[in-house]
């Protein structure tokens, strides 16, 4: 019996897993074997009847699908609307619970991730356009029975506490919650514990991602030039409970708001054997939930 967050569900964003359609059964069996109850699915997977059948066989739920919004400093690129609509159509067919919006990555912010105030900034009008874009497609998702949240993300135009606040204040809180990715929040200079207190029940989805202090400091100093290199070559993100994240304190704070959504373990890349990192994360998460 869990002492903390008894209604919350544990899933995985399996970026550190190597998916091939020819081994989907093995892939899903491995995820289920670690005890994960849900996953982030891709558009390809959402559109595959065979994959959805295998998910049901392994009792894995389509917890979320990610929707990246291409942006300039003046807001979303209008040509991306058809892609967003397609993502929602596939998510609906797959029975996805949560649509996770985020601004797509950009090379200019990749070079200043973690020190975003020194980089290019989205304009006030751009924030307003982005808010309307998210609301438009969150409404479409709601019509299809899908919840929505927005994910502040390092190396994008919405990374920091300030940028998140500006955007979220312009978005209908009944329509779009906050997806708190604690790893990206740390990279952006924020404190996840404070974020829980600041946003409270507006946090409807959580990505559990931990951060290597050593790699982060090298990225902030410029020794590692971009976040992409920090993630892919130096493994900026580490298994939950092994880095800067105060995992137990996070769960204590979420408990104050009776959080009952998904806790999604995520590690963008990991040292081999990369899939084993997810096993470390879920065991540390379970221990912190006691």
How would you name each of these model-derived features?
Residues 132-238, 244:
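Acidic/histidine-rich catalytic cores of soluble enzymes
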Residues 242-256:
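A short, acidic, amphipathic alpha-helical segment used as a generic capping/interface helix at domain edges
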Residues 18-22, 38-51, 70-82, 154-160, ...:
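Acidic-and-aromatic substrate-binding clefts and catalytic sites of carbohydrate-active enzymes
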Residues 260-288:
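C-terminal/domain-terminus segments
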Residues 1-98, 124, 132, 142, ...:
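N-terminal pre-domain/capping segments
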Residues 78-178:
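Active-site acidic/histidine proton-transfer and metal-coordination neighborhood
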Residues 40, 64, 100, 149, ...:
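Conserved beta-strand positions in the central sheet of alpha/beta enzyme cores
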């Amino acid at each position: 019996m869990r002492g903390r967050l008894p209604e919350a569900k544990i899933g995985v964003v399996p970026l550190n897993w190597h998916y091939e359609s020819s081994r989907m059964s093995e892939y899903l069996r491995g995820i289920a074997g670690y005890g994960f109850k849900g996953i982030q699915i891709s558009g390809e997977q959402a559109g595959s009847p065979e994959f959805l059948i295998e998910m049901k066989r392994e009792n894995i739920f389509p917890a979320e699908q990610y929707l990246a919004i291409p942006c300039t400093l003046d807001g979303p690129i209008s040509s991306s609307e058809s892609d967003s609509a397609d993502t929602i159509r596939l998510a609906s067919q797959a029975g996805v619970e949560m649509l996770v919006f985020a601004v797509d990555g950009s090379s200019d912010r990749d070079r200043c991730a973690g020190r975003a105030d020194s980089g290019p900034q989205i304009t006030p009008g751009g924030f307003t356009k982005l808010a309307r874009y998210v609301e438009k497609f969150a409404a479409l998702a709601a019509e299809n029975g899908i919840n929505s949240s927005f994910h502040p993300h390092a190396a994008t135009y919405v990374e920091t506490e300030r940028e998140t606040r500006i955007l979220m204040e312009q978005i209908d809180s009944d329509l779009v919650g906050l997806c708190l990715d604690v790893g990206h929040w740390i990279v952006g200079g924020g404190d996840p514990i404070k974020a829980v207190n600041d946003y409270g029940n507006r946090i409807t989805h959580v990505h559990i991602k931990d951060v290597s202090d050593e790699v982060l400091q090298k990225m902030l100093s410029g020794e590692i030039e971009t976040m992409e290199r920090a993630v892919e070559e130096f493994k900026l993100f580490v298994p939950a409970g092994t880095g800067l994240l105060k995992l137990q304190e996070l769960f204590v704070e979420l408990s104050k708001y009776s959080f009952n959504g998904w806790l999604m373990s995520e590690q963008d890349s990991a040292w081999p054997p990369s899939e084993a990192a997810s096993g470390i994360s879920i065991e540390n998460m379970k221990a912190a939930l006691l």
